[in-house]
A protein has these predicted regions:
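C-terminal, non-catalytic tails of nucleotide-sugar-dependent glycosyltransferases
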Residues: 2, 39-40, 54-125
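A short, conserved alpha-helix in the catalytic core of glycosyltransferases
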Residues: 1-12, 17-46
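Histidine-centered active-site/metal-ligand motif
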Residues: 49-50
């Protein structure tokens, strides 16, 4: 992520509740979305060195369930957020400012499904 420091400070950077494990990237994007950021640039030609959780693999650290954490925090899972808010993984979707998602029947039913999952996990917590 390449984010201006003022914006990073405004949204609070990565949330500790998603560390260690997964979910910190979609959480940061959701916090940016909630702060009215609508321009997300994807760069297709770059090198990334990812060491595949080398720290957590060597120790007895219990990983979080990022999908569950995200669901409990925002009321829907990261897949739903990526699909309807960030318009999926297609780089051609990122040519202009993103707009609020348009509610379709499919989106509505997926949102209802997410809400059932949310209440299920809330009851179990």
């Amino acid at each position: 992520h390449l984010i201006h420091k003022q914006l990073w400070d405004k949204v609070g950077g990565f949330s500790e509740e998603f560390n260690p494990g997964d979910g910190s990237d979609p959480d940061l994007c959701m916090k940016l979305w909630n702060s009215n950021v609508r321009v997300f640039k994807c760069i297709s030609q770059f090198k990334v060195y990812h060491f595949n959780s080398i720290t957590t693999r060597k120790s007895n650290i219990k990983l979080n369930n990022g999908t569950r954490q995200f669901l409990l925090k925002y009321g829907f899972n990261p897949r739903f957020f990526r699909k309807y808010y960030l318009k999926g993984n297609n780089l051609s979707n990122y040519i202009d400012k993103l707009k609020e998602p348009k509610i379709s029947m499919i989106m509505f039913f997926e949102l209802i499904t997410n809400k059932f999952k949310y209440f299920y996990h809330k009851i179990l917590s």
